[in-house]
């Protein structure tokens, strides 16, 4: 994950092979393939490759940590609206999020933690989009499981993963998401 690498660089745990300044405060860091393997080995990381990407995606879903309910809601939105290439229009995902959380509130249930825009209310579609892209989507994007095309406002399941997943895999993903949401909301009630 990019945040972890940035933190390791800042803490002096990892040294890039090349760093190029970008603007006043940012740097692009580059690593040789051998360096990446060594860093992963040193810190117990496991590289995501085209060969293991679909398996890593499924494992990530099975074991996903949840500070908020956003990851499973995003996956369910993707399943609901994706086309035959694994693409979904971002406005459809925004609609799904709004419908999901507003439906919970309409049925007298907690939408989310009190700090969440969905619990507070008064949010705009732009607020929801920003929330989706900064919270659940970014984590999937950092691992290269999902991609975003800004020009046409779509989110796409990485084609390497999408080609390997069957309908049964997607039904399993939705089932895992439903169970994760159920556990999350039980925990939130306490």
List PLM regions with ranges.
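Intrinsically disordered, charged low-complexity linkers and terminal tails
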Residues: 1-190
